[in-house]
């Protein structure tokens, strides 16, 4: 099956558990349509470069999936219809990277710097 990576931005007024619940919800959508959610990372609340739907911040999540194209199209369709999801980006990749994403690596480096002080 093809491999995909998705980045989702959810509204800032959601709690962290609600944002994680969105990830689980869309993972079940994939599994119901014959795919699977391989891995996901919650990047936290980040400030955006410009306002989207009058929001300056958003909950960012990164998902890796192994699913057929119709399952991904259905998940994207439901994400775009969901009121809590502001933006979705999906790309098809040849293989998933084993390491954490660049955003998570940056977070770990920042954590190391804070401990040194």
Curated annotation (Swiss-Prot):
Key words of the record: Ribonucleoprotein, Ribosomal protein, RNA-binding, rRNA-binding
A Pfam family the protein falls into: Ribosomal_S6
Gene3D superfamilies the UniProt entry points to: 3.30.70.60
InterPro entries, per the entry: Ribosomal_bS6, Ribosomal_bS6_sf, Ribosomal_S6_plastid/chlpt, Transl_elong_EF1B/ribsomal_bS6
Domain of life: Bacteria
MF annotations from Gene Ontology: small ribosomal subunit rRNA binding; structural constituent of ribosome
Family indicated by similarity: Belongs to the bacterial ribosomal protein bS6 family.
Known role: Binds together with bS18 to 16S ribosomal RNA.
Name of the featured protein: Small ribosomal subunit protein bS6
Organism: Roseobacter denitrificans (strain ATCC 33942 / OCh 114)
